Amino acid sequence: MTKFILKILWLDENVALAVDQIVGKGTSPLTKYFFWPRNDAWEELKKELESKHWITDLDRVELLNKATEVINYWQEEGRNRPMAEAQLKFPEVAFTGSA
C-alpha cells in the first residue's frame, strides 16, 4: 500500500520536489517544495525525510530514488520537453507546472 506520493512542479528553469502523505482518499502535505538546480533539492528532501523518524528507511529510499530519476531526466532532456511527456515516463508521480 502506497503511503506517500512524490509531487513535482515542472518549470522552465527549475524542477521542484515535495512529498505528500496519502491519508484516506486524499493527501496531506508532508514537505515543502525543494527546487533544483536553484538549491540542492535532493539533499534538502533527504534531510527533511530523515527528520521524520516515523518514515521507514524503505519508504525514504524509494522516494529519494524516484526523486533522483526525475531530477536526472529533467537535467538530461526533460527541461526541453513538455510536462506531459514526463507524466508518461513517471506515472506514479504527481506533476503540475507551466512547462
From Swiss-Prot:
InterPro entries per the UniProt record, alphabetical: PSRP-3/Ycf65_sf, Ribosomal_PSRP3/Ycf65
Origin species: Nostoc punctiforme (strain ATCC 29133 / PCC 73102)
The protein's name in its UniProt record: Probable small ribosomal subunit protein cS23
Stated family: Belongs to the chloroplast-specific ribosomal protein cS23 family.
Subunit-structure text: Part of the 30S ribosomal subunit.
HAMAP family named among the record's database cross-references: Ribosomal_plastid_cS23
GO cellular component: ribonucleoprotein complex; ribosome
Record's signal peptide: none
